[in-house]
């Protein structure tokens, strides 16, 4: 090698870059393997659930949670790629010199030792492809690409060597075709080769470049180097480079190999640089900067030119790192997107399942109550309406009498052959005529009475039946069993229509209605005829008159009400029976839903969240590197906080290191990280910049999660000790309420609002931090978490909602009003945490100080009310606080008039 002493930084840094790639690739491969196993398990569990519980869950919550096949295949290809350094060049001498420079030793012959020139000057060059791999012992062999080793006597086998013999590099004229295609495998015990393989392409006279690169299209991640020994590239070489770009869509690092005369004066752009820029083979902005090009997105990566071989490491190492990282960043971004998408689906489905578990029993109970109210109301109408109905029938008959007589006189009989002069007919025909006249009267009377009866219960149909049908429709949809409960629901709706839509019963042509009409007709007194009369209009009128007078309004009313009650009772019983069947179906479904909900909360979501944390942390360390820990800022129950001067272009930062002791804590931390990372940025919350998993924490004895977040000036505890004026304290209270309201609006509970979890900037504006206990309500398991003084009584029962944050704010507001960090007397007297909890559950609260403003005291009392339902909503607390602040702080002379500091 020309300058072996200069190869140190290049070898060291390049080996480190490939080592980091391989280490990160192992982590990525492990995460991908566990992700595939997770989704396979979800799919199997889902299939087993469907097979044991019928079709209920077949179209249920977990069908959309899957690993898209094309994403999985793409990621499998990425993690399966081995890093390669591909060396191309204008001629074999330039390639060999670049290889020697990279390995730091003169392994390949140069100059006269290498034989004749290749390319345009020496067309007889027959140097074959070289492949460098790692091994414990140095050896050379010929092998067909991707196949088997050839038994061939090489010159290197005949004795000791330091430089590969020229005869072994060249294809001999007498070799058979198989040996002419074989590549020379050189095995070395070398640090760089432990991390990556190196391939030197053959002379173009031996094999065209596109054929030589064909084996590199799959399963490798190439770092492409092109050695340039001339001032510019020829047209054939540019064409060759175009084929390289078509075969392998990766950027190329061009390396100028020094020749005897200096090609260009120092500090000037070379002709080669201008040519490469014009051909869009390198980026014009990057130039030949010794520091390397800035980070670029994978799709926008460009080649680079290194014009100084002695300073090659300053160009090649950043270039190699960029190529290696870009693919891994893309892969981790894709994998994390799959994790986050499915995790969000899990959380949303947990909300849906929790709501289903809460609302379905209420809907069933509501349906039962409403039907009972409807039944009672209609039965009351049937019982009290009989006398009214009798009067209504009499009034109806009186009002309709003349019209009925007129219609009867003009009635045209059916199925009776009438004579032209209305002569007397047989007794049989006369009976038919009388029956038709009676039918006319009964039908008209039925219509009139039915319309009036319907109007009397119309408001009940609108109030009850519509609501019942909507409830039934909702219950039907939530069963997920169209073959079973859908029929029951439809039957229930048919019963409702038949029983309660009164006009349908009266107006339909059903057998029930015909029976009803027959019963009414039996009330009419039979008319006997001695001699068959002449069927004239007067006769028809007389028959109708007698029929109307023979009707008994009392019996008719009694019959109608009796029918109404009978149908009502039977419908009520059928409804109750069908509702019980529907409830039984829902009971089994809800049991399975609750089991699935528990699995989502306890197993599925936490496991996926851990995979998401790992993929996101891997992406962050690829993009921004591992953060440097500064001085310790503080310690908490679950971690240590350090200063971090700069990370990801943000400074200063705070770094919280958490060492989860077991899988449960890992999963909890991962879920909490997901909730926090998913939150939109808000000025009242401390920003979380990213995370890194440190596998070497504590000298490699444990694994720590490093959470990098926004650095603020101090916490509220320190601020109160230092002294804050009233206006600042009230503004802090407003800021905290605004932050809690935002969290609640995102469906999250903080569960640990306290002085040390409120940070202040240099203007003493507050931000909420430490979302360690932050969770959506649907994902809570009822665990007892928080700081004892700020914990609401219901937290000890495990059943609570977001009002626990209102309680905690009430305690925090007490401290803000006192202006000190001194414990309330009721809490200071407690000798242990258990005694404190007992007193809080019994109703012990902070005392009122003489300096407190009345409105402030009322607000904090309302916030820490023992009954969660009696605590004010934060939407009410915020304007109340603003009103207090306006009243107490508008006039600077009154800032301390109504509320004095007690410290």
From Swiss-Prot:
Signal peptide: none
GO BP terms: cellular response to fibroblast growth factor stimulus; embryonic organ development; negative regulation of apoptotic process; positive regulation of ERK1 and ERK2 cascade; positive regulation of fibroblast growth factor receptor signaling pathway
Entry keywords, A to Z: ATP-binding, Cell junction, Cell membrane, Coiled coil, Cytoplasm, Developmental protein, Kinase, Membrane, Nucleotide-binding, Serine/threonine-protein kinase, Transferase, Tyrosine-protein kinase
The keyword Cytoplasm appears for this protein: yes
Boundaries of every Protein kinase domain copy: 627-881
Ranges in a coiled coil: 382-414
Active site per the UniProt annotation: 752 (proton acceptor)
Main localization, broad class: cytoplasm
Subcellular localization: Cytoplasm; Cell membrane; Apical cell membrane; Basolateral cell membrane
Reactions this protein catalyses: L-seryl-[protein] + ATP = O-phospho-L-seryl-[protein] + ADP + H(+); L-threonyl-[protein] + ATP = O-phospho-L-threonyl-[protein] + ADP + H(+); L-tyrosyl-[protein] + ATP = O-phospho-L-tyrosyl-[protein] + ADP + H(+)
Function: May act as a positive regulator of ERK phosphorylation downstream of fibroblast growth factor-receptor activation. May induce both caspase-dependent apoptosis and caspase-independent cell death. May play a role in the embryonic development.
Family label: Belongs to the protein kinase superfamily. Ser/Thr protein kinase family.
Record PANTHER family: DUAL SERINE/THREONINE AND TYROSINE PROTEIN KINASE (PTHR46392), DUAL SERINE_THREONINE AND TYROSINE PROTEIN KINASE (PTHR46392:SF1)
Official protein name in the record: Dual serine/threonine and tyrosine protein kinase
Organism: Pimephales promelas (Fathead minnow)
This protein's encoding gene: dstyk
